[in-house]
Amino acid sequence: MFQTINEISIHPELYNQKKVLIQGWITNIRGNLKIIFVELNDGSSFKNLQCVLKKEFIDFDKIENLALGVAVEISGIFSNTPERQQFGEVLVETLEIKGNNYNTNFPIQNQEISLEVLRQMPHFRHRSRLFRVIMKLRSALFFEIHKFFRRQGFINFSAPILTSNDGEGAGEVFIVDDENKDFFNKKTTLGVTGQLHAEAYALGFKKVYTFAPTFRAERSNTRRHAAEFWMIEPEVAFFTLEQIIELAVKLLQKVIKSVIIRNKDEFIFLEKAGDKNLRKRLLQFCDSQVTQISYEKAIELLLEHQEKFEEKDLFFGCDLKTEHERFLTEEIFHMPVVIINYPKNLKAFYMHQNEDGQTVAAFDLLVPGIGELIGGSQREVRYEKLLARMNELNMNIEEFQWYLDLRKYGNPGSSGFGLGFERLLMYITGIENIRDVIPFPRTNKNILM
């Protein structure tokens, strides 16, 4: 029976002086004519297992093709080594090569290779140590989010990826069709959000959420934007703006703390590689009240520091740039912050219109290092108000009649938000580019594979 490196590293004392059988890939190799040290990784952990090959046990002539990247199966006696940095090593008794390199060197010759270089080989970069850590945390975060919603009584809802509606109204969509251009007999796009369909299902299940890929044809070439990314979108019937903000904060604090607790070694590695205060900063947020201010107040605060920004044209109704959002979180509040009641011209058509006639019941949750992490709102439930807003924006009413019809039959109102999964992973890991937290990034002018 095969063991995993993760199993052995968690409780090395249980395997001390016992025979183990491991399959994995060589990440480092060094030695001489009498002894060879091989570091092995099997994907179960970012940690490597040191394997010692001695000439008296292994025929070195039969393993002359050993090299970085080669897949092997080894058996031998494991020794726990608590006095060293590593958790233990295996004295190899048998070694069988299961997958050789084909007349070439493995592309990742240095485990400290930069993220910029790794982006050019997305099919191999998960075999580097840093990217392995990032992807393991991505998987852990994925499951913690599903666990949170399950415990909160939510139903997971699968929104369609193909849709005839632009839920954000920005027009930044990918158009889908077949060669004859008549497959659906109407304009069809990849979904920019699952929210509109989630609203329909919230009227019956009350608490629903989607967790799926989202597609936006944004030509923004920034470290925060991608054409394909994952979104978490809960929708709750009967909820007000304040209640959905409370849910958003609770979600972040719960899943971040859980991921930190369950992945201690990965965070130690990240802190050594970059932000030494990573866990301290994250846990401080998890244990704190989140400040909430109005958009109007945010503009007032930013105007006090106007000279520090590239975009100095700040006024009620302007769209906050990333530099403004980060300044609020990093220089003024030194923590994540929630901004509410945005001007309606900045937000989507479906948001509840406030009594002042100028703002909508919307919120953005901003975090240091990134800016906007979550955007949400209370939905407009009043049929005439919603219809008037759609006409004001010259929307195709016929295409959205089904959405208007939701207001006709027992609609108590609902609220929801969208959380960018990759941006959350960036915040948790301290990784600065969205291209480095997704397996195969798709961005403007870039689609490898």
Curated annotation (Swiss-Prot):
Organism domain of life: Bacteria
One GO CC annotation: cytoplasm
Gene3D superfamilies in UniProt: Bira Bifunctional Protein, Domain 2, Nucleic acid-binding proteins
Signal peptide extent: none
NCBIfam families: asnS, PRK03932.1
Family according to the record: Belongs to the class-II aminoacyl-tRNA synthetase family.
Name of the protein this chain belongs to: Asparagine--tRNA ligase
Record organism: Mesomycoplasma hyopneumoniae (strain 232)
Species classification: Bacteria, Bacillati, Mycoplasmatota, Mycoplasmoidales, Metamycoplasmataceae
